[in-house]
Amino acid sequence: MLGEAGKPATGASKAMSSVSNNRVEKLVQSIAVLIVDDNQYMRKVIRNILVNIGVKNIHEAADGIAGLEAIRMFAPDLVILDWEMPLLNGAELVRIVRSPGVFPVPDVPIIMLTGHVERWRVIEASRLGVNEFLKKPVSGKALLDRIVAILTCPRAMVRLGDYYGPEPRKLFYEPMQKMGVSPPTAPETAEPGAAKLMV
């Protein structure tokens, strides 16, 4: 009895999971992503990950200044940004972008993807208004989880004193749960306490 009663639920769960996966797939396929990284090899690695998870519209910039111009030119749905770059580093780029009334696209979601994960960088990225902070090398699943979180649970942009960026996290997981998507875990950082600063 219990086994038979469980069968419809299992089937329904699989069907809901399939629908949810289709929705996520369509969302991911519809976005335009800008990769800003001075390392050509890393741009290729990130591009390959994005292609493998279904992203079709991908642009690249080799430094912060080129990244700013690209954001102005085509207003991507998401920016994946390195920290250490020539001419203009990632932190400086975020500071310029998060300037409503000055920069034309201040609300663009930003994922900081860097091999430099010292605690002060995580704190600084959070203060500057970065949406997510990930450590290189990143897995396809980790990157997909963050992208899905940004697409399905967009946090309102708020101004708090000198800060302009996504509202600090509270209860933003309900829309994801309705789609059958598990909320992402803490960012992949080298220091155990650093990830908590982004929550």
Residue map of PLM features:
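Active-site beta3 strand of CheY-like receiver
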Residues: F74-I80
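Short amphipathic alpha-helix used as the core "switch/output" element in two-component signaling
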Residues: E69, A91-V105
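Receiver (REC) domain active-site loop signature in two-component systems and cognate sites
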Residues: M85
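CheY-like receiver
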Residues: A12, V24-K26, A149-V199
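Two-component/phosphorelay signaling modules centered on CheY-like receiver
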Residues: Q40-H59
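Alpha4 helix (beta4-alpha4-beta5 surface) of REC/receiver domains from two-component response regulators
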Residues: R47-N48, E92, P106, V117-E132, ...
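Helix N-cap/capping motif at the beta->alpha junctions
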Residues: E60-E69, G90
